[in-house]
């Protein structure tokens, strides 16, 4: 099974591609970066175009994303919803199934603590995925955590709230 983890953002969208067989292996991870000067429609098009390249290269089976969280800024929340929608539609066109996890569940699956800090999650990810360092923006490590949550061994997944 190949899992695509996405951490959507209006300017930086993290992605991770993991392969789960008897173990979990990192195939790729990084971030889709949008120009701040671009209009919303151009940013969405860029995200979809880059996402399609990832889908064509790795042929994932499932899309894993965090559920919607509360945002203080309505404009930011609206844009995040548009990015999530673009990602969902694109992945649906490619036949991916969809799994959604709460931020607390992701932290619990990776670090064993639903209130873990980003640093604790990154530290555990390095150990779980046998990485010496996680390069790139935090959005990339968040996407790795989201993908790991779906690809993690069943005993961990069954304990999530």
Give the location of each predicted region.
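Phosphate- and other anionic-substrate recognition elements at nucleic-acid/protein interfaces
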Residues: 1-161
């Amino acid at each position: 099974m190949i899992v695509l983890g996405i951490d959507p953002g209006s300017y930086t969208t993290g992605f991770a591609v993991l392969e789960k067989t008897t173990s979990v292996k990192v195939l790729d991870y990084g971030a889709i970066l949008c120009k701040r000067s671009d209009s919303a429609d151009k940013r969405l098009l860029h995200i979809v175009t880059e996402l399609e390249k990832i889908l064509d290269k790795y042929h994932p089976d499932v899309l894993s994303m965090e559920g919607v969280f509360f945002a203080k800024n309505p404009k930011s929340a609206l844009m995040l919803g548009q990015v999530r929608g673009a990602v969902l539609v694109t992945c649906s066109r490619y036949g991916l199934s969809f799994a959604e996890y709460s931020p607390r569940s992701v932290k619990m699956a990776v670090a064993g603590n639903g209130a873990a800090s980003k640093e604790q999650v990154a530290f555990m990810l390095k150990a779980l995925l046998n990485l010496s360092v996680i390069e790139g923006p935090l959005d990339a490590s968040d996407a790795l955590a989201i993908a790991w949550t779906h690809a993690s061994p069943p005993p961990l997944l069954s304990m999530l709230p």
